[in-house]
Amino acid sequence: MKPNYSIDIAINCFRPGGGMESYTFDLVRGLNAHGIKPTVFAAQIDTTIPEYRQVDTHHVNQKKIPKKLRPFFFSMQLAKLRQNRNIPLIACNPSDYADIFVCGGTHLGYLHNMGKTPNLLDRLIIRRNRTNYSTAKLIMAHSHLMQHELINLYGVPSEKIHVIHPPADTARFYAKPEEIPATRARYGFKDDETIFLFPSTGHTRKGLDLLAEFFEHTDLPIKLAVAGSPLPRPMDNVIELGFCKNMPELYRAADFTIMASLYEPFGLVGIESILCGTRVVFSDNMACTEVMNENAEIGR
């Protein structure tokens, strides 16, 4: 029987991108699997992706708003578009009055871990976060680390927070050992080299500088393969792959997935890598380690 209700989802960009965009796609696919076609409110909408056919959309027009100010106007624009809509809202971005606010990171936590002093824009973001959290009915934290930050940095009541780790798509991410040799050849990975995969759309936060310092000065037969944002400069022993649409095969082709994040509210790449049969080398502050055992396997 088809459900007789709908759900609204708010996200800045409904297109391939970072963690929250990927999470939104997982959410859309999951809702569709239960017969629910959600309505997505976004400032940027990619009409070419398969998930576009699984949703209704409303465009939040921000073209006339200066880029740095757009996130601060989104919530007000969203409220106008949703006027008289008695439909639950899941906020996957900093939107107010959400029925469920998905917390995949806090700005105070980010500044603390990055060692940054807040400027005017940071203070505005922190103020916006406080209204997001105070007006939300429930907050879904991606990790116990996020729960800790919400309670201790923002004073959010603990009973308002539910820790639910992000889902991983096991229909996409799984081991396929028989295809590894051909996939490695296609990416140009040599048989006598150990490949460390570094998926990143935010190199400073993810620890590229620390990793590059080692990889550029080693004589070991190893390579760092960077998938995502462009490199800031050419680097020895570092392969620039650019944005990769087929991450499952890339995980399988690598020998390890590595990250040295300064701040990682969860880090779904760790779970995806292990599902694909590839071991991980992570800094112990990455929240995805909450669901791994000492052998870097997914706990149950």
Question: How would you describe each model-predicted region?
Answer:
Residues 262:
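Aromatic "clamp/platform" in nucleotide-sugar-dependent glycosyltransferases that forms part
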Residues 279-282:
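Short hydrophobic beta-strand element within catalytic cores of glycosyltransferases
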Residues 190-206, 212-215:
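Conserved donor-binding/catalytic core segment of Leloir-type glycosyltransferases
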Residues 267-270, 288:
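Short glycine/serine-rich donor-binding loops of glycosyltransferases
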Residues 145, 167:
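Carbohydrate-associated surface elements
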